[in-house]
Amino acid sequence: MRRILNVLSSRAQRRLERIRTAPIRIHHKFRPSTQVSNGEFTWKYSTPTRETWVRAKTMFTKEPKTIDWLNTLPSKGTLWDIGASVGCFSLYAAKSRNAEVVSFEPMASTYSVLEENIHLNNLGSYIFP
């Protein structure tokens, strides 16, 4: 009997979690996003504005020297990204270099997109905004 209650309890907990997270899942489903790849890795970016879309799509061409510099970061190194914006370079370092990243972004609206991008790429254990 106890086992049945545990299964029911577990099932009820999963159902409640789905109900609780429904607004977030709906939000992500309808919020515009784009994917960027360098051939080895792929990143997903929330693109609520044209500027965020352009920033994501040009991350490898707009600042190639920054990408080159990030490639010199030791594997599992630490990066402090000051003025992280929507997190293009934070996400790049975390995924491609397996780096721990501390990201600073002072603008609240941009910070919320940064947090969403961290979530979309499952990098919450690597990037700390």
Regions found by a protein language model. Name each.
Residues 1-122, 126:
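S-adenosyl-L-methionine
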Residues 129:
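Donor nucleotide-sugar binding/catalytic pocket of nucleotide-sugar-dependent glycosyltransferases
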